[in-house]
């Protein structure tokens, strides 16, 4: 029963998670070039690539991502669950870092990052970490589960 509770807390993002993982940081290109700005779709593609690669928990600039998380443009800003985030965008994913890195390299998300770099001057770095800590967010996605009409 406790294992099931822990799995559910991980899935809804309301518990802290610690473990090995991978970090991808994106930085907007030149401010005077509209096409050189990271947009919501870029973040969604990368997050989906990380889930596809075996991530167990993901965050963007400290905001936990779950299946119910909204990542949207709001004018010139990007919001994660209606909270503004800005460049540089730090996407952290906890999971088997070596397996995840190899799997991510073969996803469309990896190709998309290369496209952004080569065609839109958006810079990115990837790092493997032996320990990452993603904070739980009881006020975020998990809380939405209780607000059904």
Language-model regions, residue ranges each:
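Core subunits and conserved enzymes of cellular information-processing
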Residues: 1-149
């Amino acid at each position: 029963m406790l294992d099931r509770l822990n799995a559910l807390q991980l899935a809804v993002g309301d518990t802290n998670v610690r473990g090995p993982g991978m970090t991808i940081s994106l930085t907007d290109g030149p401010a005077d070039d509209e096409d050189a700005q990271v947009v919501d779709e870029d973040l969604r593609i990368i997050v989906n690539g990380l889930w596809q690669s075996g991530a167990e928990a993901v965050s963007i600039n400290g905001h936990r991502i779950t299946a119910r998380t909204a990542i949207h443009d709001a004018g010139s800003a990007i919001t994660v669950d209606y909270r503004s985030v800005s460049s540089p965008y730090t996407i952290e994913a906890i999971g088997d870092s070596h397996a995840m890195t190899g799997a991510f390299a073969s996803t469309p998300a990896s190709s998309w990052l290369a496209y952004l770099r080569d065609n839109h001057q958006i810079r990115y770095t990837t790092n493997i970490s032996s320990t990452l800590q993603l904070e739980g967010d009881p006020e975020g996605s998990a809380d939405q589960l209780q607000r059904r009409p």
